[in-house]
A protein has these predicted regions:
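Condensing-enzyme catalytic core mediating Claisen C-C bond formation in acyl metabolism
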Residues: 10-16, 20, 28-45, 208-286, ...
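Active-site pocket-shaping loop/turn-to-helix segments
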Residues: 19, 70-88, 138-145, 163-175, ...
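Active-site-proximal alpha-helical scaffold in enzymes
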Residues: 83-95, 146-149, 154-157, 163-195, ...
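Acidic, glycine-rich active-site loops and adjacent beta-strand->loop/helix elements
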Residues: 112-115, 169-172, 197-201, 252-256, ...
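Conserved beta-ketoacyl condensing-enzyme motif
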Residues: 13-14, 35-152, 156-157, 161, ...
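Active-site-adjacent elements of ketosynthase-type condensing enzymes
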Residues: 118, 198-218, 256-268, 292-306, ...
């Protein structure tokens, strides 16, 4: 599949979105939460999660079996439950066309960090503690595989086209967006559910706590968050009146850099994406950084502010209000952008830039053209 930019007439468009977030279930809960500006942070139940009573941004009251029902969810882990729930939220919208959005011509792409670290560690632990290494619960084995969540989404809703999991940390959402556009432009799918999910768990808490301690300048710890977001991508010629275009994906570009090189390389990445989109910095109405913890997030925000100005960078609420949602960050950023643009008379036809930066060095930038609601 060529990464060459598609002609304007065939550039993929985003026609719908949904979310399961610390604001609640569904797109409207996110819109209402952003409008209210309310905080989603609260101390976690230490006994329930096996962690200190630290602040975190959890999806309120989310229990997989209560949300999805008891059938087929006995051994489903949290990240899979979040992913299946968010896809269902989009497919259950009144405007949805199940015939087009599921089936053999529908694809699903999911961005993640590692899948479920909790499931991987639990499965390994039982193997080490059992009388024999194979004394494990076979029902738990699928959860320990990174592509479990994506596979369950497709099985649950009958999505029989390409099914892909991309593990890329904080930039996974934009990697999934890029991959989704290539599936459409190559004709391998008629629609794509572009998804990203991140869970809160004991394993993730301790991994983040110990790994962040080694990062210079990251003394101010960001509370962990969780959730999932999904975008429906289609070719313009397959749109229906019920699902009009919300945004056109003009370009996605990536780079790699760490430390002091992050800011200049990110600026080069943004410049490359704008060039591919045939745009200039002055054309950009909103720019959304991924609010990475510590110095990395500071460098990312400084780069966008230098390119576009403070007003442009602050036009869309920061994804950091959901805490550190890691792999789900950039998909939530796009959801925030679409929610904000829908309430603005000046957004239609304007450009938006979404960037993401991961501490392992991956950088990404997407350029979108907003469409009037």
């Amino acid at each position: 599949m060529s990464a060459t930019a598609a002609p304007a007439a065939t550039r993929p468009v985003i026609s719908a979105w949904s979310a399961v977030s610390p604001y609640g279930l569904g797109a409207q809960a996110l819109v209402d939460g952003l409008s209210s500006g309310r905080s989603t942070v609260a101390p976690v139940d230490g006994a329930r999660w096996g962690v200190p009573e630290v602040p975190a941004h959890l999806v309120p009251g989310f229990e997989t079996r209560q949300v999805l029902g008891k059938k087929g969810t006995r051994s489903m882990d949290r990240v899979t439950g979040l992913a299946v729930s968010v896809v269902g939220g989009l497919l259950d919208q009144p405007e949805a066309d199940r015939e087009r959005e599921t089936g053999e011509r529908a694809a699903l792409v999911l961005g993640t960090t590692t899948g479920s670290a909790e499931s991987m560690m639990d499965f390994t632990r039982t193997s080490l503690r059992g009388e024999a290494p194979f004394d494990v619960d076979p029902a738990v084995m699928p959860n320990a595989v990174m592509n479990c969540a994506a596979g369950q989404c497709s099985i649950w809703y009958g999505i029989r086209g390409p099914n892909t999991t991309l593990a890329q940390g904080r930039t996974a959402g934009l990697a999934a967006l890029h991959y989704s556009t290539r599936l459409l432009s190559s004709g391998r799918a008629g629609s794509v559910l572009c998804t990203a999910a991140e869970e809160f768990s004991r394993a993730r808490y301790w991994l983040e706590r110990h790994s962040r301690a080694a990062e210079a300048g990251d003394d101010a710890e960001m509370a962990l968050g969780e959730g999932a977001a999904v975008l429906l991508l289609q070719r313009p010629d397959t749109l229906s009146p019920a699902r009009p275009a919300l945004a056109e994906v003009l370009a996605v570009r990536t780079r790699v850099a760490t430390g002091d090189r992050t800011r200049p390389v990110l600026e080069a990445c943004v410049a490359s994406a704008l060039e591919a989109a045939g745009a200039r910095p002055g054309d950009v109405w909103a720019a959304s950084p991924s609010d990475a913890p510590g110095r990395l997030g500071e460098r990312e925000r400084q780069a966008l502010t230098a390119l576009f100005g403070t007003e442009t960078v602050e036009r869309v609420p920061g994804v950091g209000r959901l805490g550190d949602v890691s792999a789900a960050s950039s998909t939530f950023q796009i959801a925030f952008l679409l929610a904000t643009a829908a309430l603005s008379d000046e957004a239609a036809g304007r450009l938006a830039v979404v960037t993401s930066a991961d501490r392992d060095g991956s950088l990404a930038c997407a350029v979108l053209r907003l469409v009037a609601p």
